[in-house]
Each structure stands twice: as C-alpha cells, then as structure tokens.
Amino acid sequence: MKPSEVSNEIRVAVLGEWVPPQLADVLALQRAEEPEIAAALIGGTADDQPAPQPGDGFDLALSTADRQWPGWVCEALWHDTLSIAVAKRSHLLAYREVPCCEVLKQPLIRAQSTAGEPWRVVAQRVLGDALQDREQLVGSFDIALTLVSAGYGIVIAPSARLAGYLNRGIAARPLAGTPTVVMAYLLHPRARLTEPMVRFIQRV
C-alpha cells in the first residue's frame, strides 16, 4: 500500500484486543492541532474478524506485538512495568512489590490472546521460565481478570493493561525485580511518508 499523496484522513490500524490508553491523547492532540486531517481507527479483534494486514487500506498501525512486515518499519513506542492482578481480598496486597517466589505459589491465569506480546518473554525470564507449566489458559483477558476478581488466581500483565480493571474487584501490585517492557509498537511504511503522517507520528 502506498500512502495517498492527497488525503484528509490518516488511517491507523489497531492490532490486538487492547487499545493503549495513550492513543486517546494522541488523537485529541491531532484533532486540536490539525483538525482538517482526521484520524480514523480500524481494527479487527473479534474471533471472526481477522486483524488488518498490509494492503488493507491503512497508513499506520499500532500493535502489541513486534510484527515484521516486508516494506514496513516496526518501532518500540510505549513502555511499562509488569504487575500482578489479584483479588481485592488477597494476602499479596501486604507487599508493596510482590516477590517472584510468592507469585509462583499462587494459581496463575493467562489469556491466550496475550501469547504473542513481547512482555510475556520478559515475564517468563524473570520467573525462571516457570510460567509455561503453571498457568491456566483462558480465551481472553476479560475472562482472566474475571477469574482473578472471583479469587481463582492471579494474572501477570503490564500495569497499563490492568488499570481499566481496578474498579472490577481487582487490585494490582508491581512484580518485584522486573525491567521495563514494551507495551506497543508503531508500524509505518519504509517508503516516503506524507507530511500529515510525519506530523502524526511526531505527536505519538
């Protein structure tokens, strides 16, 4: 796909079930500073709706995974730290940061939809590659956090992913000893970008 040389719209594909909260600030800034160029979001997150691919008519993409598309550049965009989601009555709330040894004593729950996200590799490494055989696998992040709220186990995830669930019967604590993780990537064509696209990327 080649970016349109004359367009009053920037089409941004959002890949995955999670939308980074920072995107709202970027869209608001775009609307305030360049209202004549609209930013349109497209995406496919339902099971029967495939994720957009290069050539599907978008200019830029945001992804939680490091995607390698021919002719596109993938750049780390937003970063975060790993946290533990627990039920609000959990004894783990006594810790300011939850030690890895305590995490491995708990029933662990993982959403299948997060399997390809790069922070999973960091979590595995920090916990000594002990997650693979210990986690109960469920279909979506929403289901995983519902089980956490009910006291069935805990979830490891970036802090920003958990923020929207803190009013749904869960609490979060940082996972001790973890490095910063990449939360989202920006993908753009390797070819020359239009001026509106360049300015949009600068706002990001």
Task: Give each language-model segment a name.
Residues 73-83, 159-160, 167-183:
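Short beta-strand->loop
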Residues 22, 173-204:
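A late-sequence structural motif
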Residues 23, 106-130, 194-195:
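Secondary-structure junction motif
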Residues 33-41, 126-135:
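A local structural motif
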Residues 7-68:
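Central regulatory/effector-binding core of bacterial HTH transcription factors
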Residues 72-82, 86-108, 198:
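Flexible hinge/capping segments at coil-to-helix
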Residues 64-70, 120, 141-171:
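A ligand-binding cleft/hinge motif common to bilobed small-molecule-binding domains
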Residues 1-13, 70-73, 94:
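Short helix-loop hinge/linker segments at domain boundaries
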